[in-house]
Amino acid sequence: MCSSELLGCALPMAIGAAIAAPERPVLALAGDGGWLFTVAEMATATDLQLGVVLVLWDNRGYAQIRQSFDDADAPRMGVDVSSHDPEAIARGFGWATSTVREPGELAPAVAAACAAGGPHMVRIVVPA
């Protein structure tokens, strides 16, 4: 059975780390579903111009919870997130964005985001 107690904590924790150690790079990893819990914190990172890089795993939903439904042979309910554009949301908060669709694109995208300074989302598009 999966556990979802930590949904949404990546971005707020990254903001705290960036405030505590501004000289160090901060990289947060989040799924698209969990990120939606605290998406408004993007404004905090922008206001403080924190060099946070958010790597967003975009599978258009709550994949672990979706799998729990499947494992229990139960109908899926409330686990698919398909009505948002994460990059448009991030840009609306003043973040730079980039998209990764192939494994070989990830390392260069993260390196470029870290080098750019300021808040940046690297969206990894994966099958739902």
Q: What is each PLM-predicted segment?
A:
Residues 1-128:
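Thiamine diphosphate
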